[in-house]
Amino acid sequence: EYAQFEDRAPVTTRKAYWVMTYNIGFGAYQRDYSFFMDGGKYSRARDEESVIADICGVGDVINNTAADFVFLQEVDIDGTRSYHVNELELLNEFVTGYYYTFAQNYDSPYLMVPPWEPHGANKAGLVTYSRGEITDALRRSLPISDSFSKFTDLDRCYSISRVPVDNGKMLCLYNVHLSAYGSSEEVRSGQLGMLFADMKADYDRGNYVICGGDFNHNLRTDASS
């Protein structure tokens, strides 16, 4: 899914741009919130009002930051855990002047865990906002585990949004949220290998590449490398 509008803002070379990446945690993560799969207490947001307040806060952060490109993860469009608030629609009421793409990367059946407060059924995805015109967008499915964790990893993917640059090249915006819970090294390596191969292919074509998102693990044990 993507949206366009008439006011086209060209992306130019030799200009500094601001980039923001933000896992918004389905609108649940307040200061004292802890998620059950991280060893915490909760599986859902506190209530509908808190979800709406948190998402409005995310919109304020984006507007106040005035980033040119924004990568968001865990944006629910319909979920038990977020009280069926369509967070994409709510964000778009606050965030103006952007083109955007949405790529669904989570579509779970009704999960009966934890037993005291089931996580429920949820649909969520990746949202990419761009001041420059997005002329092409692609969703790429990632390999996932065959273990029980596949029920929390359904439809893992990354999105590629392409923005024309004034020199004829493309700016390729990669938005990613890799597997976290129970994933094997083989799954992690497969996901990163696929992502890096696509990024390199775009780079080798002479395009510009920016990747933002939640990798769920350190990409390098030695940051200097």
Residue ranges and their predicted role:
Residues E1-F94, Y99-E117, K123:
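N-terminal, active-site-proximal structural segment of metallo-dependent hydrolase catalytic domains
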Residues A9-V19, N122, L126-D136, T152-N175:
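Beta-strand-turn-beta hairpins that frame and shape the catalytic cleft
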Residues I24, V75, V176-L178, G213-F215:
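Active-site metal-binding loops of divalent metal-dependent hydrolases
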Residues K41-D47, V75-I77, L142-K150, H177-E186:
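Surface-exposed cleft-lining segments at the edges of enzyme active sites
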Residues D68-F69, L171, Y208-I210:
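Short, Asp-centered acidic motifs that coordinate Mg2+ and/or phosphate
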Residues S183, V187-S225:
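Metal-dependent phosphoesterases centered on the DNase I-like endonuclease/exonuclease/phosphatase
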